[in-house]
């Protein structure tokens, strides 16, 4: 959402940035939302330009032309309660976006680490991830001056990410074991993906 800057609560933008979502001085948006954040923000629907976004946590609803509507299967209601002890214990101010989300999931009772690192290899202009097991893949990256990245998956899917200089987590989608994911940039810059 973009708002006139005097109407915007800057703390919301700072929160979005701290957990890997896109936020700035006069805007914030859901780019970078993981399933945990999507559930907490009650993001029931996703509009995409990719016909292959259906996966174990998102189902296809409808499509028209090159626009597709998907429904997230796990969404909390608009109003929900969180234990005050969790709120007090979750200090994300000195954590990177992945650790911040893992800490929140742990405080909420998750038995396992929610987001784990997958090895990747980066060279000038391209990063590669070899997926070892079926998983929903997200990527973070070092600060970059590149403004757009393109994802190419060995099963034929592609996705473009714009305004990546804003520093949000990349939603690479659900991938099966043996899939190769390439993230390319046209600036021939080395973008380290983790």
What is the meaning of each model-derived region?
Residues 1-194:
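Soluble catalytic regions of membrane-associated enzymes that act on cell-envelope
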């Amino acid at each position: 959402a973009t708002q006139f800057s005097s109407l915007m609560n800057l703390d919301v933008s700072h929160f979005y940035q701290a957990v890997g979502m896109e936020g700035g001085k006069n805007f914030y948006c859901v780019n970078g939302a993981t399933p945990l954040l999507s559930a907490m923000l009650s993001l029931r629907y996703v509009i995409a330009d990719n016909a292959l976004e259906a996966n174990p946590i998102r189902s296809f609803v409808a499509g028209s032309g090159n626009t597709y509507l998907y429904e997230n299967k796990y969404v909390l209601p608009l109003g929900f309660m969180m234990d005050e002890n969790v709120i007090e214990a979750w200090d994300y101010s000195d954590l990177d976006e992945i650790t911040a989300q893992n800490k929140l999931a742990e405080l909420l009772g998750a038995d396992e680490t929610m987001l784990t690192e997958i090895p990747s290899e980066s060279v000038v202009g391209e990063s590669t991830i070899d997926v070892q097991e079926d998983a929903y893949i997200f990527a973070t990256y070092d600060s970059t001056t590149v403004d757009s990245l393109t994802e190419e998956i060995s099963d034929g899917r592609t996705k473009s990410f714009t305004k990546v200089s804003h520093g949000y987590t990349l939603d690479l989608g659900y991938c099966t074991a043996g899939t190769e994911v390439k993230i390319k940039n046209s600036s021939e810059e080395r973008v380290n993906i983790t």
